[in-house]
Amino acid sequence: MKVTQHLWFEKDMEAAIGFYASLIPGSSVHWVTPIMADTPSGPAGSVRSASFTLGDQRYMAIEAGPLDPFNHSFSIVVECETQGDLDRLWNALREGGSVEQCGWLKDRWGLSWQIAPTRLGELMSDPDPDKVRRVTAAMLKMVKLDIAPLEAAAAG
């Protein structure tokens, strides 16, 4: 048994998944193909589907016109080892999109992402509740997450 997330794009699916795959090491687009039968979304050939991998996570996608737009109930979380990787990914994904609090952003296609340092999970799960409160307070003041201030908050 395999579990795979599936994304519904109104348009520009191939551009979106190609862009995502170019940003994350170990990613690739496996295939993009038209659905050669009439569907509720359009005539044969007008709807396309795809398979792609981001890092070690496989996804499927469809480009089938408007349905429900992406929203915060689904996001892709990327944990970055370094601030440089976090900054690079954040800056690329936010181009043409919008940024939000605590490392969240929406890309130009409306898909929500959480770009976070790997270290954040370690800091947030520390057994010292005072440390966790300080880290949380620091994080809540940030839009793009920054490892150094989070580490400083943890240190007190």
Language-model segments: residues:
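Intrinsically disordered, low-complexity acidic/polar segments
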Residues: 14-16, 61, 70
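A charge-rich, low-complexity, intrinsically flexible signal that marks solvent-exposed coils, linkers
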Residues: 40-41, 72, 155-156
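Short, solvent-exposed beta-strand edge segments and adjacent coil->beta transition regions
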Residues: 2-4, 71-75
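Core segments of cupin and vicinal oxygen chelate
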Residues: 7-56
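Short hydrophobic/aromatic beta-strand micro-patches
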Residues: 8, 77-79
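Vicinal oxygen chelate
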Residues: 30, 51-53, 60-64, 68, ...
